[in-house]
């Protein structure tokens, strides 16, 4: 068959399927899970990603289930405001920034794929075990001896990608950053503006990231995503996304009683907690091998400190679709896609390790020796804070100037 075969029905795979279909390029998606369900917690979609989703006609659908994030706020662990800035359209972007439940995003993409491309073009319970290729196409292999043929294959199967492991068998396990995370969602009254992305504290003693992902219910409560992050030199290899225990981390936030949020009470109100290590992989020298290539987390997994993982997968899909539209030969198309995206994502992977947006918190933590301040201007200038924030936007490709170029 002449189809592009997409391995993985997550955010990257579904967005790619919609993008290829819009360009008239036939595709099929093969997903390991028996059913694609609305699972997970919250993520952020920055304006460079929402711009691409708007091109696919999805902005209205996303607006109905997401929060249009209006501002970012940075606090120390004493609840003192360090810096705040507008986000999305409030910052003059042409497109919004969305804070959204990962499951809601997944369902918007899945519903759009089924209605536009066809429910018969996505195959669940199809765990790809490997890929072979020849001059005419590729063969995906599944358990029990099943297989399927296509023109080319794109692996969108995440950080534990089977196809990535096939091409890089000696790479080893994902690289642990030294930070452990506990994540949850809590129904709570609106915090700050009710559309704020809030970061507080620092990793050495405990850091929180907090943002709403659904509008308030009739009782006035929003669904609010939170992430607790603490430097933990070692972690025991356990199930990814395992159930977490409050006792393992809540002590770091026991005295976080601020006038804008009682953090311990907020954490304890979560229905459940997930625990997993903050990991990435070292950037690869190449993604493409003939008629097979990698996309999203399969290509460039990054630590989640820049609200950028899903967004970079979405940007990959645009580059991939453009390359396949311009090149009838998938080998040439994949080479063009890799040339467009590999260096850019490598910079982001490395920047997320050392100077992500929360570097603002690190800078103040170090300059104050983790003590309260009388005035933030005595610690760091406003211009320095703006420069730290703008630097990441430039590297990650979502400055206003870059998006209007």
Region locations from a protein language model:
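Short helix-loop capping/hinge motifs at secondary-structure junctions, enriched
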Residues: 188-194, 216-218, 235, 259, ...
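Conserved mid-domain beta->alpha element of the FAD-binding
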Residues: 5-24, 28-34, 154-155, 182, ...
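C-terminal helical "tail/cap" subdomain of flavin- and related membrane-associated enzymes
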Residues: 1-2, 79, 285, 306-307, ...
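Acidic/histidine metal-binding catalytic segments
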Residues: 64-65, 121, 255-271, 330-335, ...
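A short coil-to-beta-strand element that immediately follows conserved catalytic motifs
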Residues: 178, 193-197, 223, 258-276
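Short glycine/proline- and charge-enriched loop/turn segments
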Residues: 31-34, 87-93, 231-235, 317, ...
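Conserved N-terminal helical subregion
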Residues: 2-4, 21, 46-168, 172-185, ...
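Active-site substrate-recognition segment that forms the wall
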Residues: 75, 196-235, 253-255, 278
């Amino acid at each position: 068959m002449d189809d592009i075969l997409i391995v993985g029905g997550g955010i990257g795979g579904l967005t790619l399927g919609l993008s290829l279909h819009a360009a008239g390029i036939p595709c099929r998606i093969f997903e390991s899970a028996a059913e694609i369900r609305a699972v997970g917690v919250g993520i952020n979609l920055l304006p460079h990603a929402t711009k691409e989703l708007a091109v696919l006609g999805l902005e209205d659908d996303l607006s109905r289930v997401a929060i249009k994030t209006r501002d970012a706020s940075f606090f120390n662990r004493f609840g003192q405001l360090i810096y705040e800035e507008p986000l999305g359209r409030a910052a003059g972007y042409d497109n919004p920034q969305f804070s959204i439940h990962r499951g809601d995003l997944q369902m918007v993409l899945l519903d759009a794929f089924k209605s536009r491309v066809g429910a018969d073009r996505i195959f669940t319970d199809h765990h790809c075990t490997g890929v072979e290729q020849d001059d005419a196409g590729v063969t995906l292999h599944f358990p029990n001896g099943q297989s399927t043929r296509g023109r080319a294959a794109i692996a969108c199967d995440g950080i534990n990608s089977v196809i990535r492991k096939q091409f890089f068998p000696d790479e080893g396990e994902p690289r642990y950053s030294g930070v452990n995370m506990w994540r949850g969602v809590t129904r709570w009254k609106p915090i700050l503006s009710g559309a704020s992305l809030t970061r507080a504290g620092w990793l050495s003693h405990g850091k929180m990231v907090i943002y709403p992902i659904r509008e308030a219910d009739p009782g006035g409560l929003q669904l609010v995503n939170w992430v607790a992050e603490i430097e933990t030199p070692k972690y025991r290899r356990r199930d990814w996304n395992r159930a977490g225990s409050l006792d393992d981390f809540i002590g770091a936030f026991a005295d976080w009683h601020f006038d804008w949020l009682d953090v311990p009470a907020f954490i304890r109100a979560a229905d459940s907690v997930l625990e997993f290590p903050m990991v990435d992989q070292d950037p690869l020298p190449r993604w493409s091998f003939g008629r097979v290539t990698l996309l999203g987390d399969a290509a460039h997994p990054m630590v989640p400190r820049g609200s950028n993982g899903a967004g970079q997968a979405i940007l990959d899909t645009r580059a991939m679709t453009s390359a396949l539209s311009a090149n009838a030969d998938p080998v040439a198309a994949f080479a063009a896609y890799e040339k467009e995206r590999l260096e850019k994502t490598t910079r982001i992977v490395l920047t997320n390790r050392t100077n992500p947006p929360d570097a603002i918190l690190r800078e103040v933590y170090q300059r104050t020796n983790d003590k309260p301040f009388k005035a933030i201007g005595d610690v760091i200038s406003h211009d320095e804070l703006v420069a730290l924030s703008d630097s990441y936007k430039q590297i990650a490709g979502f400055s206003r100037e870059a998006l209007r170029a």
